[in-house]
Amino acid sequence: MKKSVRLLGCVLVLFCLLTGPVFAAAYRPFPDNRSISEVFDSIKVDGSYDRTRIRLITANDEAFYSRWKMVEDARETIDCTYCIIEKDIFGQSFIGLFVKKARQGVSIRLMIDGRVYRMPYMSKMPDKIEELAAFPNVQIKLYNSIRKSLVSVFTDYKKIVASNHDKIIICDGLVSIIGGRNIGADYFAQNGENDIVYNDSDVLMQGRHVAGQLKKAFDDEWKFNRNLVVKADAINFKDQLAKVELAYRVMTRYMQGGGLFDPEKVTDGKLKEALIEMNKEISAFKNISSYAAFQMFRGEREKPVKILDKHSHTGPLNGITPALIRMIEASRHEIIIQNPYLVITEAAEAALKRAADRGVSIIFHTNSAESTDSLFPQAFLMNDWKRLLQTMPTARIFVAPSQNERLHAKMFVFDGTIAVVGSYNMDPLSEDLNSEVVAAIHDKAFAQMTRLRILRLIEKKNIEYRIEVDERGKIIKTYGPEDHVNEKTVKKMNFMRKLQWLRPLI
C-alpha cells in the first residue's frame, strides 16, 4: 500500500514538473485596473442592467448541442439570425427542428443574409426554407436582399455588399447564444471529419436583460426596409418538408447515440434515397453522439455582461468599434486579440501603438495563408505584419500553420479583466460594412478562462512571425509568411496585396 502511494506521489510530482511551466507561463495574475472598469461602466445598454449566467463554448460538439437544446426546449418564441445555414445534414436538420417547433405553435422569426441565400452552393436549401415559411407562426426574411439593394449601385455601392454578420439565437426571451459560428458541419465537426473544420467560440447566456438587448439588436436589422420576406411557393412541385423532417429524425437519433435508421424500412423511394445519403454523411461525424449527457449550464455563475451592437453600412449604430478602442486605450498590462482576419484599421492600429508605447503586452492570434478561408486578408497582412511588430515592440503575432488549426474565433481579452466574444472581425468589413454583435464580460475569472483557452490553442501548434532590429531600429532579420507558405500562394498574395483599393471591402 505504502509503495503504491509513494509511486502515485512520484507520478504526480513528475506530472507537475512537466506541466507546471506551461501553466505558469499561461496563467498571469493582473492587478485591478480602474480605467478599464470605467470603460465597461460607461457602456450604455437598453433597459435594466443586471448580471447574466454565461458559459464560454469553444468545443465544436458543445456548440451544436447548445443551439439544438435551446431551440428544442423553446416553448413560446425563437428569434434567430445567421449569415449561413448550410445545406448539409446540420443545416437541414436545424430547419427540420424549426419545423417541429412550428408545429408545436412556437412563434419563429428567422433571418438569413440575402447574399448567401441564392449562392450556387446553397442549391435546394431555399426550397426547404420556403417550406418552413408556409407555417402561419413563422416569419422569414432575407437581410438586405440584392433585388432591393441594387437601387444603391450608383449612390453607395457599399450598401449592396452590406451583410448581416450577426449570429444570434434567442429562445423564450431568456436563453441566448452569440459568437462566430454559422450553422453547418464546418463549425461543428472535428478534425478529420470534414474538409473544413474551424476553431471557433460562442457565449451561451441566460438572463432576460441580455436577451432583451439581443432582441433589440435583432429587431433593428429585422425592420430594415430592404429585407425581403420569404414566402412559401404558390405551387409546390417538390415537397421538401418530409426531407427536412427526416433530417431532424436522423440527427436526433444519431446525437442520442442511437446510430442510424435502416433505409430498408422506408417505403417511399425518394425518402429512402435521401436517408441513404444522410446516413452516409452523418456517419463521418463520430463526436456528436453524446447529446443525451449534455447540460447547457454546469454550475456557471452570473457575471456582469453587456451587449455591444453594430448596424451594417445601411444603419447608423456602431457600439463595438469605439468601445474596443476605449478598452485598448485603458489597458495597462496585456491585450489579446484572437481573430481570423487581421486587417487592422488606422484607428485601431494607432490605439494599439499607443498601448505598446505604454509597455502593454499585445498578442495577436490569427490565420496564415495556409489555414485561412479567405486569402485577401492574408495578402494585406503581408503588407502590415513587419510594420506592426516594428512600431509595436511589445507585440507578438501567432498564426495557425495549416487547415488543421484553421481559426474562426473572434475574442478579445483586456488586462485579464474584460473579455469580448462575438462575431466582430478585426477588418474593415466588420468595422464598416457588416452588422455585428458581441458580448463584453467584466469578470476576472471569465476573462482569465478566455485568455487561457486562447493561449492553449496557440501552444498546440502555431507559428510566430518575428523580426530582429538593429540598434537603429532597422529590420535585419525576419520570419514571416514567405518562410512557411508555399511559393505559388505567396506569388498570388504578392499580386493581391497591391490591390489596395480593395482593402476597405476586406
At which residue positions do the language-model features occur?
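Secondary-structure "cap/kink" motif recognition
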Residues: 70-75, 102, 325-333
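PLD/PLD-like phosphodiesterase catalytic module centered on the HKD motif
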Residues: 23-55, 63, 104-175, 185, ...
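Phosphate/adenylate-binding glycine loop and adjacent helical scaffold
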Residues: 78
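Bacterial N-terminal signal peptides
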Residues: 9-19
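Active-site cores of enzymes that catalyze phosphoryl transfer or operate on phosphate-rich substrates
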Residues: 52-55, 251-319
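Bacterial N-terminal signal peptides that target proteins for export
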Residues: 1-9
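A short acidic, amphipathic alpha-helical/loop segment
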Residues: 69, 93-97, 326, 347-354
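Non-catalytic, alpha-helical, charged scaffold/linker segments
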Residues: 207-209, 213-260
